[in-house]
Amino acid sequence: MGLLGSVVLGVSTVAPVYCLTATLGPTVTAVGVRMPAVFLAGFLPMLLVAFAYKELNKDFPDCGTSFTWTAKAFGPRVGWMAGWGLTVATIIVLSNLAGVATEFLYLMLGEMTGSGWVADLDRNTAVHLLTVVLLIAGATAMSYRGMTATKWFQYGLVGLQLAVLLLFAAIAVGKAAAGDLPDSIGFSFSWLDPLQVGSFSAFTAGLSLSIFMYWGWDTCLTMNEETLGSAKTPGRAAMISMVTLVGSYLLVAIAAQMFAGVGTTGTGLGNPETADNVFAALARPVLGSPWSILLFLAVVASAAASLQTTFIPVARTLLAMSAYRAVPPRFGAVHPRFRTPGYATVAAGSATAVFYVGMSLISENVVEDTILALGLMICSYYALTAFACVWYFRRSLRTSPRDLLLKGIAPLLGGLLLSGVFLQTLTDAWAPDYGSGAVLGVGSVFVIGVGILLLGALLMTCYGLVRPEFFRGETLRKETPALVMED
């Protein structure tokens, strides 16, 4: 896989159209018209952390990425928790992707057939859950066969997403500039100033959402052994993916805000009734009929593409953890024909389906709370990786100004920023009114987020008692050579 394929992989995993429809509304609710500023601010810590990934990958291109690098820098237990954070974050994202894909699939079919009955099928719990499970099974099967077999499929889906976003933004800006929309607002450069956000708490709430929007760009690094020029190409691909994402996010955020405004009624981006699915509300007003189908199709394509590629980081992380004896050996099984971590892929798919069905049957609000808690997982393992870079290269930081900046200062700042978001989110989530409810007076998002991290610590402790080799530092040390998947 070359540079283009790696970039497509990174963008595909992030699923820009899905991220935008899911986060435009909540971000406006948190910070109002400063939404573009928060998207830009969320890019900064991710860019700084990207330097850490790039330098670590150049020195040690291992498919375990965060798990391997953090273990080498800080020891096996910290590395194990970084791997756990990535694994759990992936399962939460995968389950939500399947849910959004199902919703838009029936909306698209309803729009195509002109049937409200078809569009409303998603409201039937049994139909919804069955469709979600089928989508997860299909994505698992495609990931099981490997990226090479579906390369052109991914190219097409990513190209469709970016083309529809450009079309949507152009038409939205054009209609807003015409001046005949009641809720439209004129562009102001103050929208790009994060210092004008009302409060630090509101800023971190919006920042947590924007960080989620960039999650997954590092997927191209987990396939570094299968990439041409594995020392440099994955790092370059990660950077190009990041720039592509921030450009498309800013363009669509500004266009949507100009067209719909930030009001709490009608098509306003702050309307609580449409906040979790903005494109469903804006598709027809912006694109008109029948072209609104394109936006529904783009969301389905975005979720479908990401469903397949998002299995890659978790499967390869589990493969690496198995190779270093941090998890049971069967997770390291590689399919003899497709050369993919088959057992880990199927296990991730099964866990995703069970998680989504279980959470949905408990309460729809619980699903939403797990998404809010996702920011804690993302910030934790990205920050650990950034700090790992600084510590790993600490003896070579004085070699040149470049090394000091890219291996030291930039990753350190990125790690500190993400740690700040983590701690502020943790503080806010403690409040009983944060999320859908409270448990013993503590916000449900705090309970879920901290509970998942504590569950990881418990599993790590139990496995360490059964198979202590990894935790004694016998299987993975700083001098251990990189794990390579042989063809």
Which sequence ranges carry the predicted segments?
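Extracellular loop-to-transmembrane helix junctions
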Residues: 19-127, 244, 444-457
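Helix-loop-helix connectors at the membrane interface of multi-pass transporters/channels
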Residues: 68-71, 99-127, 159, 164, ...
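TM-loop-TM module centered on a large, flexible mid-protein loop between adjacent transmembrane helices
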Residues: 68-70, 75, 107-112, 190-193, ...
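Helix-loop-helix junctions that connect adjacent transmembrane segments
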Residues: 35-36, 113-127, 155-293
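Membrane-interface loop-to-helix entry segments
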Residues: 129-182, 238-242, 377-382, 392, ...
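Membrane-helix boundary/coupling elements in multi-pass transport proteins
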Residues: 85-100, 214, 218-227, 289-329, ...
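Membrane-interface "cap" regions at the ends of multi-pass membrane proteins
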Residues: 1-24, 29-33, 47-51, 463-487
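Terminal cytosolic tails of multi-pass membrane transporters
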Residues: 1, 386-410, 428-487
